[in-house]
Structures are given as C-alpha cells and as structure tokens.
Design a protein with these regions (language model features):
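Domain-wide signal for the mature, well-folded portions of proteins, strongly enriched
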Residues: 1-4, 10-15, 31-32, 55, ...
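Predominantly a Rossmann-like dinucleotide-binding segment in NAD(P)-dependent oxidoreductases
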Residues: 1-73
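C-terminal glycine/acidic-rich active-site capping loop/insertion
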Residues: 110-166
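Exposed boundary/loop context
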Residues: 26-31, 76, 104, 145, ...
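Short beta->alpha junction loops/turns
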Residues: 41, 98-100, 164-166
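Contiguous beta-strand/loop segments that form the cofactor/metal-binding neighborhood of enzyme cores
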Residues: 44-129, 133
C-alpha cells in the first residue's frame, strides 16, 4: 500500500531506426495522426487513470518536443511528447512518450507511505511476469545530521498476456 497517491510518472518509448520516420506508419500523419502519443502515450495515460480509480483530471497539458516532417501531403506527427494531468486533492501525473529515445517502459507511483516502481508496465521483460519494487524509505534527522535509508522489496506477478511464450 503506497497510501494516497501524490504523483504518478511514466515513460514509454523506443528509438526508431534511421528509416523509421520515413517508412513507419506510426510517423505518417494520415495513418497515425497522433504519432507517439496515439501509439505509446495512451499506455501511460491509461496507467495513470487506472491508478487514480478512473477519476477525470481537472486539467491536462501537453507539449510536443519533436515532430516528424510532413509526408505525402499528410501533417507532421509527434515523435516525442510529454503530458501532465492534475487531479482533485492535489494529485498529479506526468508522462513522456517517444520514438526518439532509448527503450523505456517504466512507471512510478508516489504515495504518502511508499513508492511503487514498475520497470516493465507495458510489455513484461520475461514471459508473462511483471516485477515491481515497493519502497518505503526512511528519512532520519538528528539535529543537523540526516540520512536517507532505503527499504523495500521486489514483487513479481503473473500477467495474462499474448506475449507469454508457449
């Protein structure tokens, strides 16, 4: 139990090869007009909304960091995008999705009791098993001396998935 959620952060992306922007449908405005947001970002959004019990955000902002060149008369599409969602009670979520950065598919849930880290929240690294760390760090303050001590444990869960071998 992480306690009440204060912030969620997630990232899903991969580095497309040198021909990606020119040849892949994900970078073609007529075939995937939302680019990395439509292909990858929705995983981050759904994770955040699921963790927040489907609560609607109060407001949402986003920024395109990089976009494709227009192709064959079609508009450009986002190649790198970040977003922010604000929820009632002061909770928030941020995410980044990209076709132009090293592969990443992590999520972090910060609560007032603990931190939950998931390094493979979209595609399990091994078969149908996802792992997460539940971290309960302790901040020790003695007058002007302070120390941060990490405490936590790794958990594994079976995930029904079509990605599982066999």
């Amino acid at each position: 139990d992480v306690g009440p959620i204060r912030h969620l952060a997630s990232q899903f992306g991969f580095m497309g090869d040198e021909d990606f922007e020119r040849t892949n449908i994900r970078a073609h405005g007529a075939l995937e007009p939302l680019g990395c947001l439509g292909d990858l970002g929705w995983y981050c959004l759904r994770f955040s909304l699921w963790a927040m019990n489907e609560a609607a955000p109060l407001y949402v902002t986003g920024r395109i960091h990089q976009e494709s060149a227009p192709r064959e008369g079609s508009p450009s599409v986002p190649l790198a995008f970040s977003g922010f969602l604000a929820f009632a009670g002061g909770s928030s979520a941020s995410f980044y999705c990209s076709f132009t950065a090293a592969h990443a598919q992590w999520a972090v849930v910060s609560g007032d009791k603990a931190l939950l880290q998931v390094s493979d929240f979209v595609l399990p690294f091994s078969g149908a098993e996802s792992k997460f760390n539940l971290i309960r760090s302790e901040f020790i303050l003695d007058r002007c001396q302070f120390d941060m001590q990490e405490g936590g444990h790794l958990e594994s869960v079976e995930e029904p998935s079509s990605n599982a071998p066999g």
